[in-house]
Regions:
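Helix-to-loop junction immediately C-terminal to a conserved catalytic motif
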Residues: 52
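Catalytic Walker B motif of ABC-type/P-loop ATPase nucleotide-binding domains
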Residues: 163-166
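Conserved ABC ATPase signature
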Residues: 138-142, 146-148
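Short coil-to-helix segment of the ABC ATPase nucleotide-binding domain corresponding to the Q-loop/switch region
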Residues: 98-107
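ABC ATPase C-loop
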Residues: 131, 135, 155-156
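Conserved ABC transporter NBD signature motif
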Residues: 60-68
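Conserved ABC ATPase "signature" region
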Residues: 68, 105, 116-133
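Conserved signature/switch motifs of ABC ATPase nucleotide-binding domains
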Residues: 137-140, 157-158, 190
């Protein structure tokens, strides 16, 4: 039986009179690559932010290691996220006056790593993300793909339990998207739990568990084998499933 590393119970989120999430129950399992799909405005990103404690709930609970993070203080949430959650967004949010290497290193220094561990981990990730030539450049001096690979490195330098990724390839061309997705898939293959929000089928195919959100409610779930490369059967299963949901 799979172990749930994060559990949402009756998650409800409203902005004023507009209810975006309607009592969602959702477990995120250790080692899974979970994907949340849905049309624009369905509540995908809001669900990710609610599960990670970045958005306060209007109702419900979210448990991480038996702690109800939905009702935790900001100080408690900051400490919890620093060592347990990593985040990648469509925009990289890299610090503009720091090099890519410094951006990665800073995340380790403010996390749970010693100076020595931070240096070793930074060097390891720069090599893994193929950033050797770009590490000493500012974000404005590199390509979108290089910047996003640095953002992935920054997100995982503290070896988080869960990597939250909100449309990480949304602003990238096909080649750069493929590169970033390959990196996230390789991390998942080593046991990294991933929660990815996307509207892109190519990105969704990386998941082994795909959820479809419509009007703030999960209306479908598809289980796939662990991703091992492009596979026509996998693509057909996803297409048939999405067509059945009216995508």
């Amino acid at each position: 039986m799979k172990e749930a590393v994060l559990s949402g119970k009756s998650i409800t989120k409203a902005f004023g009179e507009n209810t975006v999430l309607h009592g969602i129950d959702l477990d995120i399992y250790a080692g899974d690559f979970t994907v949340i799909m849905g049309s624009s405005g369905s509540g995908k990103s809001t669900l990710l932010y609610s599960l990670s404690g970045m958005d306060r709930l209007s109702g419900g609970q979210v448990f991480y290691q038996e702690q109800d993070i939905a009702n935790a203080s900001e100080n408690e949430l900051t400490k919890l996220r620093a060592g347990n959650f990593g985040f990648v967004f469509q925009r990289t949010h890299l610090i503009s006056n720091l090099t890519l290497g410094e951006n990665i290193q800073m995340a380790g220094l403010i996390g749970n790593l010693s100076d020595k561990e931070t240096k070793m981990r930074t060097d390891e990730l720069i090599e893994r993300m193929k950033l050797e030539k770009a590490k000493d450049r500012l974000p404005s001096q590199v390509s979108g793909g290089e910047a996003q690979r640095a953002a992935v490195a920054r997100a995982v330098i503290n070896k988080p339990v869960i990597l939250f990724a909100d449309e990480p390839t949304g602003a990238l061309n096909k080649a750069n998207s493929e590169e970033v997705l390959n990196l996230i898939s390789s991390l998942n293959a080593e046991g990294q739990s991933v929660l990815l929000v996307t509207h892109d089928r190519e990105a969704a195919l990386r998941g082994n568990r795909i959820l479809y959100l419509e009007d703030g409610v999960i209306i479908g779930e598809l289980d796939l084998p662990v991703y091992e490369g492009k596979d026509k059967t996998r693509e057909e299963k996803l297409s048939v499933w999405l067509e059945g949901l009216g995508w």
